[in-house]
């Protein structure tokens, strides 16, 4: 009740529309003088039930606020918490290359709309890797997109590019967050990662590909899209090129060779 009252007052007194609920330590050596020795195992379970109660009260009272759950370490996604908070901070590791595996695996169990995925500064604070703003965006745009950057350190060109990225994401957001998600290349076993989303009505296709390391001699990858109508035609919204659905699914898209590590491509198709 104390926690509820304290948080309630803060939310009432301030114009807050987003709360990240973080618990950056694990419960260790937990015990209670109240329970007998054979009931000590109940404590962590009761703790979680108490947390769910707090969430139930606060999210019901402040339904207009977006709550995001979070925790350090692995296993942070909890279906129980997702009942109260519709998204979770997927990982503190925001490096675009690492995120390929993180998001590939997380999406096996949880919807992409629940995966917090942000464009962060480079060199990355976790691994020290530098990737382009475009690659960071394309990887983050496979989840619930956000940016965590110091605007004072961005160039004017970067600011303009971010504006364009956000505008583009708004056009594909419904497809990415609620459409069908198809994995086309596995970053765990390949030197690439690729995926495509299909909107609920089948009218928009979002295809993305990331090359991890550039190589001198290799077979140029061809990716076959999935979930399309083989009898329909699809237009590349950027170039105006038109492809048959059967062509995209059975012949596939040939990825141009790029002599650069961590290069990425996104293509948006519209069903004609």
List each language-model region with its residue ranges.
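Solvent-exposed beta-hairpin/edge-strand motifs
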Residues: 226-240
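Aromatic- and acidic-residue-enriched carbohydrate-binding clefts of CAZyme catalytic domains
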Residues: 1, 25-52
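Glycan-recognition surfaces
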Residues: 1, 5, 45-152
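C-terminal beta-strand-rich structural cap/linker in extracellular carbohydrate-active enzymes
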Residues: 245-272
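An active-site-proximal structural segment forming one wall of the substrate-binding cleft
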Residues: 1-21
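Conserved, mostly hydrophobic/aromatic
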Residues: 22, 67, 140, 207, ...
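Catalytic cores of secreted or luminal carbohydrate-active enzymes
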Residues: 134-185
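Carbohydrate-binding surface patches
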Residues: 186-229
